[in-house]
Amino acid sequence: NWYSNSADYSDCLNTSTATIEFWGTLYNQIFTANNVIGTVDNETEDPTLQYYLAQALAVRAFDYFTLIQLYQFNYKGHESAMGMPLITEQNATEVAANGCARSTVQETYDFILADLNKAIELLTATTKERDDKRYVSLDVAYGIRARVYLAMHNYAEALKDAEAALAKTTATPYSRADVSKPSFINIEDNSWMWGILITEQDRVSTTGICNFPSHMGSLNYGYASVGGWRRISPKLYSEIPASDVRKGWFLNGEGVSANLPAAAQTYITGKKAPAYTQVKYGVLNDQW
């Protein structure tokens, strides 16, 4: 049961699966980022090293931002609450020997912003371009910082960074037609600014069910389609105007969505999906 840790509050224990997956994975990435940051001269003028240092700083910021949202309330009104243990390239050896006290929420967000500010500075200076969407480009760094400012309720700065991200990116939003059918699954689509290309040979694919499509894809085999359906409340569904394309991202009260191709509707009906099930995400090569 993927939800038992949360249901019995054991997800706060260091031995829980949830802790290993989230806390463990993110701090392992921070460990790697710290190694890069501690190796590269912070004031380097080498374009390649500037690029690598920016990657490490941006990823470390993203990881701490993810952690602080998982393990503490939002920023606004909780600035003095306990935040994350901030392990860096400067204190890693000391932490390994003696542990690390938690910083406050304010200190955690200050640290995140400092990393992002430096990453943006480096990505502005470097002439090296990414060759894969998995890497952080200047537009992505602005986008991450915009999200941080949103979490801090600093909407003016969030708007500035969102506009900067749009100005720097070559990505374009999905059209209404694009999202009027199950989609949001192809990293090659020009709407995606940042993400990892997953192949059929990757471990996350070969597991069959331990992946995002399994949990969120109602139109393919996985946890969702055998009973773990993701659903919207009837009340919220009724609030979505008929003219809003997002209404079709869910089955209606009769188990039908105007967004679904005939084969997809036949599939979801055959699976006896309950009313108001989410059908937003497509499947590989439209193999219903």
What are these regions (language model features)?
Residues 6, 159-288:
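Hydrophobic-face positions in mid-chain alpha helices that act as interaction patches
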Residues 76-92:
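Short, flexible, mixed-charge acidic loops at enzyme active sites
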Residues 32, 108, 115, 122, ...:
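Alpha-helical solenoid repeat scaffolds, predominantly canonical TPR units
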Residues 24-26, 54, 59, 79, ...:
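Start-of-helix signal in alpha-solenoid helical-repeat scaffolds, especially tetratricopeptide repeats
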Residues 2-71, 99, 103, 121-124, ...:
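Conserved, well-structured interaction surfaces
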